[in-house]
Amino acid sequence: MIQQETYLTVADNSGAKRLQCIRVLGSNRRYAHVGDVIVATVKDALPNMGVKKSEVVKAVIVRTKATLRRNTGNSIRFDDNAAVLINEDKNPKGTRVFGPVARELRDKNYTKIVSLAPEVI
């Protein structure tokens, strides 16, 4: 579960390395799960890339440390909290996605992120 002030790693090559969640989008929501959109600020970034430090961006959650239960009865848990930066059209800002992503992204119409990911779990 991601909430305000949670730090996340960035799972793409947009230039940002770490994010801090400042708001979970949705009407009066407290926690974000896989596939949810958050507003975050960039805490660490590579120089001469697309995003700068302290820039406010939107991101979609692709991995969480909290256990994710599926309708089939399976549960899955990742080693880190990670997000991918997106633009206003819900397309990723980067051209590559690092690490596995959850299958629930396909159900939430983030097919571009799923196709860029090396592994879908």
UniProtKB/Swiss-Prot annotation:
GO terms for cellular component: cytosolic large ribosomal subunit. One of its GO terms (biological process) is translation. Keywords: Ribonucleoprotein, Ribosomal protein, RNA-binding, rRNA-binding. Disulfide bonds: none annotated. The keyword Ribonucleoprotein applies. GO terms for molecular function: large ribosomal subunit rRNA binding; structural constituent of ribosome. Transmembrane segments: none annotated. Pfam families: Ribosomal_L14. It comes from the Bacteria. Binds to 23S rRNA. Forms part of two intersubunit bridges in the 70S ribosome. Belongs to the universal ribosomal protein uL14 family. HAMAP family: Ribosomal_uL14. Part of the 50S ribosomal subunit. Forms a cluster with proteins L3 and L19. In the 70S ribosome, L14 and L19 interact and together make contacts with the 16S rRNA in bridges B5 and B8. NCBIfam families: rplN_bact. This is Large ribosomal subunit protein uL14. It comes from Prochlorococcus marinus (strain MIT 9301).
